[in-house]
Amino acid sequence: MNLTGKWKKISKGECDKHYPDEIEFHEHPRFLGKKGPGQNFILWDAGGYAITDSDRVQIQIATDEQVPYQFSLSGDVLTFTDRDGCEFKYQRLE
């Protein structure tokens, strides 16, 4: 599964407010998150990631901790579920 590309968050839940409004996953497993209007702190600012299974990815969060997430890709919609059960979605921009 390939996460490479630019993504825009399309979910607006209370639990996902600390995840970036936009994120770009690079081929060399790095990512860069971008804050949206009114976002003060984002967990995914910049760092590394590793796909560890067909539906699991480990992402380096702002504290440098490596955190596992479940994910799925359906068409151009990428869905993540964090360890607290928060589900949030991104739409592929490019």
Language-model region placement:
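N-terminal helix-cap/turn-to-beta initiation motif at the start of protein domains
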Residues: 1-6
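The phosphoinositide-binding surface of pleckstrin homology
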Residues: 8-12
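Beta-sheet ligand-binding and adhesion/scaffold domains
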Residues: 13-14, 22, 56-94
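N-terminal glycine/threonine-rich, aromatic-flanked beta-hairpin/loop signature
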Residues: 15-57
